[in-house]
Design a protein with these regions (language model features):
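Short, polar/acidic, helix-capping and beta-turn segments at strand->helix junctions
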Residues: 2-143
């Protein structure tokens, strides 16, 4: 079982999610832990693939908490449609997919077949507050 934290609040002028019809677009979230810690740094630098994977997994938990707050019940999720994973990477780091698997694997663990999604895993030079990852997603929900 996964304990969902209080959803992390936006850090700038945006909202956690927007519903358009039966789609929910969730803003990017990072690996913020319930105790307030964040996983910061660069993959291929001071962060290992395993640490990045765990950070992406925590990001998935944070996004699930946003979804639950918006929907009231995760059983209203019809499917995870699209995931965009941004990985704070050193110039030669090429294993972004292995990191973002921490997010994807949890979505499949929670939702089964309907957790399988289209995805991009992209290396970037920096992320807000030095986060190791930032991940956004699109979710289809029942009426």
């Amino acid at each position: 079982n996964i304990t969902l934290p209080t959803p992390p609040q936006p850090v700038a002028n945006y909202v956690n999610g927007v519903r358009a019809g039966n789609l929910i677009f969730l803003a990017g979230k990072g690996p913020k832990y319930p105790d307030g810690r964040e996983l910061t740094g660069k993959l291929g630098g001071n962060i290992t693939i395993d640490q990045g994977y765990e950070g992406a997994r925590q990001t998935a938990i944070n996004q699930l908490s946003v979804l639950k707050e918006m929907l009231g019940d995760l059983n209203k999720v019809k499917r995870i449609v699209k995931v965009l994973g941004l990985v704070n990477s050193s110039p030669n780091f090429i294993d972004q997919p292995k990191v973002v698997n921490g997010f994807s694997d949890l979505m499949v663990d929670v939702f089964g077949e309907k957790g399988k999604h289209a995805r991009a895993a992209i290396g970037v030079n920096s992320l807000p507050r030095g986060q190791a990852v930032e991940i956004e997603l699109v979710v289809e929900v029942y009426d």
